[in-house]
A protein has these predicted regions:
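Transmembrane beta-strand segments that form the barrel wall of outer-membrane beta-barrel proteins
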Residues: 91-92, 123-125, 142-152, 159-182, ...
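Outer-membrane beta-barrel translocator domains and adjoining extracellular loop/strand segments
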Residues: 161, 187-192, 216-222, 234-237, ...
Length: 542
């Protein structure tokens, strides 16, 4: 697709200050038109040179010079498979023989970074014997994740151990197994993901959770949208299993039920307008769900078994806008911050003849937008959905958030994040649940639960060193959190914390991978024990 204004640039206007004193003759007009027509290819060539060749270079976690200087770095490279060049080539949105398009080049770089296996992506141009060549270089991140994670908050400790390979045999496919232990349950999770099977746009993603109180399996298979210019997509989503649903009130478990579910959704989408400058997408969906809630021990809640079907239609509009930052969520790598304006409106229809006691209509809206302020940005998001039955409002949910990030000088970032949410009439287990890494960071799991909630955080980060010993980033942070959740029949429950933290990140790994050790002072509601605590876990990503 030609860049905006391309045609206009082919037709030069009169020189500045010139004046036409007499009407031109027909012969003069013909000569001018002929000259413009002959000049058009030259102008187009100057404005959009033709790409003669594309060179793809993939590099290991450590460059050859680094591996030669440090034997351990050489061993690390030898233990893994470098990403295959064809994995990079299949993501390219430009081709040899076509005009160079800077917008498509930028989108290609974003898509490559979004795969999550590279620590650095660069796309540049060069001239070889006078011809334009595009050089694509990727540097792998350490994608074999030996997970030995722990999180401690106020005397509560959770941990997980496992192995996940996000670049299996250099193909950008994912395999892994993780065991986790938290206060609610233990679980073994198996995961597999095949991107672009057989060189196509197709996707297969499966996961299985074997829990101490149930088991759940899920999958996604289809052909997703992978670029702004893609015209078609289709996917089939499924979830089958049984799981224990826990409900909490004032930080204490109040109820427990077992949910048995079989859910299947087929969705297809078409984009009547699609290109690097945005898209309009139309989609249709159909779903079938069998859901049952049964008592789990004494005091359980019973919800009747239901087999139901529904149909949905949606329209989505997007105008893309991105900014690239460093030292925002992680060390020594570029991060794509999505500031696009996107609006999606969906309407679900649930006829009474498909298992519902009454017919219902469920409108949904999602909207988000952002604006770059130099190296800073402001971003907002709103989501709302409701289900109207023939005689009443059955359920509803609304959530909004605002993030302001200020990066005044290199290696430092100040972030203000605010969000609020309200829910009504949703099934058990759908309550707002804050604590232990979600919401105020120095509080235990389920410290704040309810159908209404709000929280915010103000944090300043200093990424002091990117690569100590060539592999570790070290930084410091100060933070203030405040917020909570509560039910409609109780007063607001709000608590907060203020503290300092140490940030440690593996700069040669894929992803941001920043861990935290925080010392915090707690105030307000929702805490027990000592006001001063030490918490260990992952850094929040905004």
């Amino acid at each position: 697709m030609e860049p905006a204004g391309f045609v206009e640039r082919l037709i030069p206007g009169p020189p500045s200050g010139s004046a036409i004193r007499h009407p031109p003759s027909a012969r003069a007009c013909l000569l001018v038109a002929l000259a413009c027509w002959r000049a058009a290819p030259a102008v187009a060539q100057e404005r959009a040179p033709i790409v003669d060749s594309i060179i793809v270079r993939t590099y290991d976690v450590f460059d050859d010079s680094e591996a030669a200087a440090n034997a351990l770095f050489g061993v690390v490279n030898a233990l893994r498979f470098r990403t295959r060049p064809e994995i990079v080539r299949r993501e390219l949105l430009f081709r040899a023989g076509a005009p160079y398009d800077a917008v498509r080049v930028a989108e290609t770089a974003r898509n490559l970074r979004a795969i999550g296996i590279f620590r650095d992506v660069s796309i540049d141009t060069t001239r070889i014997e006078g011809r334009l060549a595009v050089v694509v270089e990727t540097r792998d991140g350490w994608s074999t994740q030996l997970q030995l994670n722990g999180r401690s908050t106020g005397g509560e400790f959770t941990w997980s151990a496992g192995l996940i390979e996000t670049n299996f045999l250099g193909t950008a496919n994912v395999v892994g197994a993780v065991y986790r232990d938290d206060p609610d349950r233990t679980a073994l999770t198996l995961r597999g993901r095949v991107n672009r099977a057989f060189g196509t746009r197709s996707l297969l993603d499966v996961a299985y959770d074997d829990r101490s109180d149930g088991e759940v399996g899920g999958w996604v298979v289809g052909v997703p949208f992978r670029a702004l210019s893609d015209r078609h997509a289709v996917d089939l989503v499924g979830v089958v299993g049984r799981e224990r649903v826990l409900q909490f009130r004032d930080g204490v478990r109040a109820d427990s039920t077992e949910r048995r579910v079989s859910f299947h959704r087929l969705q297809g989408a078409f984009a009547p307008r699609a290109g690097p400058d945005g898209y309009v997408r139309l989609s249709l969906a159909a779903q079938v769900k069998r859901e049952e809630y049964v008592a789990y021990g004494a005091g359980g809640q019973n919800v009747p078994d239901s087999l139901s079907g529904a149909f949905g239609a949606a329209v989505e509009w997007l105008h893309p806008r991105f900014t690239v930052l460093t030292h925002y969520n992680g060390f020594a790598r570029e991060e794509d911050v999505d500031l696009s304006t996107r609006v999606r409106v969906t309407v679900w229809v649930a006829p009474s003849g498909l298992g519902y006691a009454r017919s219902g209509v469920g409108p949904q809206i999602e909207a988000r937008s952002g604006v770059a302020l130099g190296r800073s940005f402001l971003r907002a998001r709103l989501e709302a959905n409701q289900l109207f039955l023939s005689d009443r409002l059955d359920s509803a949910r609304v959530r909004g958030s605002v993030t302001l990030a200020v990066l005044p000088i290199g290696r430092q970032a100040t972030v203000l994040h605010l969000q609020a949410e309200a829910r009504r009439g949703l099934p058990p287990g759908s309550e707002i649940d804050l604590g232990h890494g979600l919401g105020p960071r120095a509080f235990r799991s389920h410290a704040f639960t309810g159908t209404r909630g709000a929280w915010g955080t103000l944090e300043h980060r200093w990424f002091a060193w990117d690569e100590l010993l060539g592999v570790i980033g070290v930084g410091f942070a100060g933070f203030l959190d405040y917020g909570g959740a509560w039910y409609g029949d109780q007063p607001r429950r709000l608590g907060g914390d203020v503290g300092l933290g140490l940030m440690i990140g593996a700069t040669r790994a894929s992803g941001t991978n920043v861990g935290r050790v925080d010392v915090a002072y707690r105030f307000g509601d929702g805490w027990t024990g000592n006001r001063w605590i030490v918490s260990v876990g992952r850094s929040l990503a905004y």
